[in-house]
């Protein structure tokens, strides 16, 4: 009898920096949407975004590791650091499936990214060969009746925290400790 695959969510992002919104969302998806684990894939570059204020790759990875160290269902990953750039999602997913055949991967994206999904490189191939889970974002509405069979709309709480807000608040010297995991906050104070 074949052992069932580990259901693993792929939560890719800049995590510039990781904050409590990322963590609460991932926690909710693990506990309420059937995922066994979530891997935080720290992205070195998003082909659809200008990254003029992107923090160092290794610092962002370190912050993710600090933030998730106390939750066994989360893993920090630098998998995309080792792929050619720009790293397109289809290449990442295909490489993950090849490297980890005992896992069933689900790509986790926000509703804002879902609306841009037709512009993604090889979007149709992603939908044909991979699972996608969409989480809600403020001011972006998705009609679940229009989604392809490989796509699931997760019913998660809306959390309006952004890494841009975090970076701006830190630059202004504001005390925003409750928006960040305590270990991340302490590391950034240094």
From Swiss-Prot:
SUPFAM superfamilies: Nucleotidylyl transferase. Keywords: ATP-binding, NAD, Nucleotide-binding, Nucleotidyltransferase, Pyridine nucleotide biosynthesis, Transferase. It catalyses: nicotinate beta-D-ribonucleotide + ATP + H(+) = deamido-NAD(+) + diphosphate. Pathway: Cofactor biosynthesis; NAD(+) biosynthesis; deamido-NAD(+) from nicotinate D-ribonucleotide: step 1/1. Transmembrane segments: none annotated. One of its GO terms (molecular function) is nicotinate-nucleotide adenylyltransferase activity. Its EC number is 2.7.7.18. Belongs to the NadD family. Catalyzes the reversible adenylation of nicotinate mononucleotide (NaMN) to nicotinic acid adenine dinucleotide (NaAD). This is Probable nicotinate-nucleotide adenylyltransferase. It comes from Phocaeicola vulgatus (strain ATCC 8482 / DSM 1447 / JCM 5826 / CCUG 4940 / NBRC 14291 / NCTC 11154) (Bacteroides vulgatus). The lineage of its organism: Bacteria, Pseudomonadati, Bacteroidota, Bacteroidia, Bacteroidales.
């Amino acid at each position: 009898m074949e052992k069932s695959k580990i259901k693993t969510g792929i939560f890719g992002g800049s995590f510039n920096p990781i904050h409590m919104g990322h963590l609460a969302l991932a926690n909710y998806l693990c506990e309420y949407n059937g995922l066994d684990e979530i891997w935080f894939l720290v992205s070195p570059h998003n082909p659809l975004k200008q990254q003029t204020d992107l923090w160092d790759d290794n610092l962002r990875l370190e912050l993710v590791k600090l933030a998730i160290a106390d939750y066994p269902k989360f893993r920090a990953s630098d998998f995309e650091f080792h792929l050619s750039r720009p790293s397109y999602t289809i290449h990442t997913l295909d490489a993950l499936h090849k490297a980890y055949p005992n896992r069933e991967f689900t790509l986790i994206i926000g509703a804002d990214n879902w609306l841009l999904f037709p512009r993604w490189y090889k979007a149709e191939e992603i939908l044909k060969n991979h699972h996608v889970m969409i989480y809600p974002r403020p001011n972006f509405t998705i009609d679940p009746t229009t989604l392809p069979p490989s796509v699931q709309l997760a019913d998660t709480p809306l959390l309006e925290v952004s890494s841009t807000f975090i970076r701006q608040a830190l630059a202004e010297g504001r005390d925003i400790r409750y928006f960040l995991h305590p270990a991340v906050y302490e590391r950034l104070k240094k």
